[in-house]
């Protein structure tokens, strides 16, 4: 199963969403996504691989955060 979420939001709203995800990770071991009335829950183990990627190109920039387990 794969669920992708891509929306245009204000920088502050993006920061708030990242904070929500960080809070979920630090307070438990689930990440919850809700879309169209459906709730998706991913169990996250105590140890994960964290990948941070920053890319600058002529047309803009991209910053990615990826957790795998």
Spans of features found by a protein language model:
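Charged, well-structured alpha/beta interaction segments
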Residues: 12, 30-32
